[in-house]
Regions:
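Auxiliary tRNA-acceptor-end handling modules of aminoacyl-tRNA synthetases
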Residues: 1-25
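Polyanion/phosphate-binding surface patch
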Residues: 2, 45, 49-82
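Positively charged, Gly/Ser-enriched RNA/tRNA-binding surfaces
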Residues: 25-42, 51-52, 69, 79, ...
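A structural preference for short, hydrophobic beta-strand core positions in alpha/beta folds
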Residues: 46, 167, 254-256
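Beta-rich nucleic-acid/ligand-interaction surfaces
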Residues: 50-67, 166-179, 259-267
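Acidic, His- and aromatic-enriched active-site or binding-groove loops in soluble protein domains
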Residues: 65-77, 181-210, 274-276
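Hydrophobic secondary-structure block in the mid-to-C-terminal portion of proteins
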Residues: 158-195
Length: 329
């Protein structure tokens, strides 16, 4: 009989003590992250791997690559469209609403498998583990500093080099609307040079075009308006204060071109990058999403979160500590 093999991009993880094994690094990373989350007095939440597909269409965005190209979705025996979760935040917020927990503040963490149909490469798989932090019910201010503090603790704990945290602010709803209007006006003469996907982004969510992977689009955007000219001074001051407070611990860079690939982000956004990962150099990201809860049927719940890809992060550890010298942290 022919052998049955694992599916493309799906890894078996086995903690056999071999320090050259990615599995061992994954287990080490998970163990340390759990300890860091405990130090920050975060509570664990676990949500189902399967969710209603509409949850991700309404949260991540039906124009996102995740929903259009990467999500594993299918109809169950009742012809209901369900999906393997491609990310963790939407499920957490769905649970918060369903359990009527959106009336109070919470500080949570989660860790579990996620699924995306993308081209497997080093540190990127079709089934991957993701850890995340969600700080819910707290207005903008202290949570931004706390989330960056958590990231700096992770970077410090693993002694990471060649990495930095990029931060930006997408402004208020009014700021964003003014910026999007200016962006659309700038891109209008260039519409014939945009591909179909970017044209759709331009018409439905112009901010997302800044996240385009199309080189021609990025060339056009070189002289586009900057969101820095549209957000208020307090937002800029927050970015400067965060950079100032943590600059002696981590490399912090204000990047006004940074947007996140998920539709629910608003206000403060960030990502951690490493030059050791090559062109796709991000291993952690997140931001504020004050309106996601109400978009999913709950009440407005000011919130901020972050997520880290475990395998991708674990692939960095060889650049920090040689495998044969790696010990438990």
């Amino acid at each position: 009989m022919d052998k049955i093999h694992s599916l493309t991009g799906m890894l078996d993880l086995y903690n056999d003590g071999d320090r050259d094994n990615l599995s061992v690094k994954v287990f080490e990373v998970e163990k340390v992250l759990k300890r860091i989350f405990s130090n920050y007095q975060l509570n664990e939440m676990r949500t189902p791997a399967l969710e209603d597909t509409d949850l991700f269409k309404r949260s991540v965005g039906d124009l996102s690559d995740i929903v259009n190209k990467e999500i594993y979705s299918f109809n169950d025996r009742n012809e209901k469209s369900i999906a393997l979760r491609p990310e963790g935040t939407a499920g957490v917020i769905r649970a918060i609403i369903e359990k009527k927990l959106d009336q109070s503040a919470h500080k949570l963490w989660y860790l579990g498998p996620m699924w995306r149909y993308e081209r497997p490469q080093k540190g990127r798989y079709r089934q991957f583990y993701q850890a995340g932090v969600e700080i819910l019910g707290y207005p903008e201010g202290a949570p931004e500093f706390e989330i960056i503090s958590i990231i700096c603790s992770i970077i410090e704990e693993f002694k990471l080099k060649n990495c930095s945290i990029k931060i930006n602010h997408l402004g208020s709803k009014t700021d964003k609307e003014s910026f999007c209007e200016a962006l659309v006006n700038y891109l209008e003469p260039h519409k014939d040079n945009l591909d179909i996907k970017d044209l759709e982004r331009l018409s439905r969510n112009p901010l997302r075009i800044l996240d385009s992977k199309n080189e021609d689009t990025q060339f056009i955007l070189r002289d586009a308006p900057s969101i820095k000219d549209f957000i208020d001074s307090s937002s800029i001051q927050m970015l400067q204060d965060i950079r100032s407070q943590f600059s002696n611990i981590c490399s912090i860079e204000i990047d006004y071109s940074l947007v996140r690939g998920l539709d629910y982000y608003s206000g403060f956004v960030f990502e951690a990058v490493s030059s050791d990962l090559g062109a796709q150099n991000s291993f952690l990201g997140g931001g504020r999403y004050d309106h996601l809860c109400s978009n999913l049927g709950g009440r407005d719940l000011p919130s901020i979160g972050m997520a880290i890809g475990i395998e991708r992060f674990a692939s960095l550890l060889d650049t920090v500590i040689p495998s044969n010298r790696m010990t438990s942290f």
